[in-house]
Amino acid sequence: MNRPHRGALHERHRIWRGRTRRDLADAYEPYLRREGIPPLQEKALGVQLFREDREEETEFVTISYWPDVDAMASFTGGDPRKIHHLPRDEEFLVELPERVTVMRILVTQLPRD
C-alpha cells in the first residue's frame, strides 16, 4: 500500500548521476565507494549507489536522503544543488555533471518483511 510520507524517514533527496566508459567502470566504482560515499554516510540520513552497465558506457547514480534543504545546504556550503567533484572525476567521467537534482519525496513504500 502506498502511503503519504510525513517525515518518518526522510523528506528530500539529492540525485547525482555520472557516466564512465565501460572500460573504466570497474576502476571507478571502488573509487566512488571509497571517496564519494563516506562523506554522504557521515552527513546524510541515508545513501544508495546504483550502477547500470550499458553497451558503451556505465551510469552511476547516487541518491542521498536528507531531512530538509537546509541540511543539504550545510553539506554543500550553500547551494544544495552544488556538486562535490572528486579529485579523479575528470579522469573517469565522460563529462562532469554540473548539478545534482534535489527532489521532495511524496510517497514512500517500503518492502514488507
Region spans (language model):
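Glycine-rich beta-strand-turn "strand-cap" elements at beta-sheet edges
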Residues: 1-10, 45-61, 84-113
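An amphipathic, aromatic/His-enriched active-site/gating alpha helix that lines ligand/cofactor pockets
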Residues: 30, 34-46, 65-101
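Non-catalytic surface loops within mature trypsin-like serine protease
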Residues: 22, 68, 104-107
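Short acidic, gly/pro-rich beta-turn/loop elements at beta-sheet edges
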Residues: 26-28, 57, 72-74, 110-112
